[in-house]
């Protein structure tokens, strides 16, 4: 089962600000591991909190990918990408 990976505007901006080597590593993770996974939840961890329950985080080195998984559409919507120290602040 192939999942479709999509980016919202904020995550596109986040990705463009990253060093090119880190950006390639993140896109490779999304393409080679997450998109082809039978269950994208098995690779990540649910964010805690009442407002954050629908979001999942994925760890790629010191960087985190915050995404929303839509089972009905087989889609993973990436909403934020950033360093683990800063990605949760906004």
Task: Report each predicted region and the residues it spans.
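A short, surface-exposed loop/turn module that caps and links secondary-structure elements
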Residues: 32-57
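Secondary-structure boundary motif
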Residues: 17-20, 36
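Enriched for short, Lys/Arg-rich terminal
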Residues: 2-4, 9, 13-17, 24, ...
